[in-house]
Amino acid sequence: MKTDYEFLKTDIDGHILTVTINRPERMNALHPPAHAEFDEVWNEFDKDENLWVGIVTGEGDRAFSAGNDLKFQAEAGGKMDINMASSGFAGLTSRFNLTKPLIAAVNGVSMGGGFEIALACDLIVASTNAKFALPEPKVGLAALAGGMQRLPRQIGMKNALGMMLTGRHVSAEEGKSLGFVNEVVEPENLLSAAKAWAKQIEECSPMSIRATKQVAYENFNEPDLEKSMKAHYSAVKELFGLSLIHISEPTRLSLI
């Protein structure tokens, strides 16, 4: 994977990829060139068999991401491209076929599209100074990058509407209470805490993890348990269809 991105920083530690939004002067808000870089990064992450877990965070402690770069939009004459890459905001929010787990390490502001990036991840680790919101209705917009769909699925309709209809800011601790934050840590411990989660995942079979994620997501809204358990899943078929397995460490399976 290349490392010379203009608006992102990438780091690889073992099987873990960390992607940092590197626009602190814009509160890590995203504009079209940043979206394009994200799309490229996640494409590479998806196809690289040596990368098993991803972490996304923001440079500095002020913001994970303030969402859409409204200043850039104003400078461009007010045009807003809602038809970005098919993979969505940050190349992620409409990327529904990614079976590798992603962790959002949220530092500071996570607003609008920034919150939607975090919601598109599988786990959220937040610093004590993190603030979450979908404030689009306050400025006559709507959370079009999956926020209106993902938040009710993750915390229930009443809790989600309580956030979405008011645009109110939610602290990391309240986010944990509501159920969309997995862990709250001090700002100086944020990245190490996210990496600790990633390391635990890394200790598992990557193919088992992918199968688990696929089944969990594809059956989230399936009310028929029997139908869910009898369904066919490509990642499960791949996992149990192996003809040659090498056990290199306890509980870890890898292809030869």
Feature-to-residue mapping (PLM):
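Conserved CoA-thioester-binding segment of acyl-CoA-metabolizing enzymes
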Residues: 1-61, 243
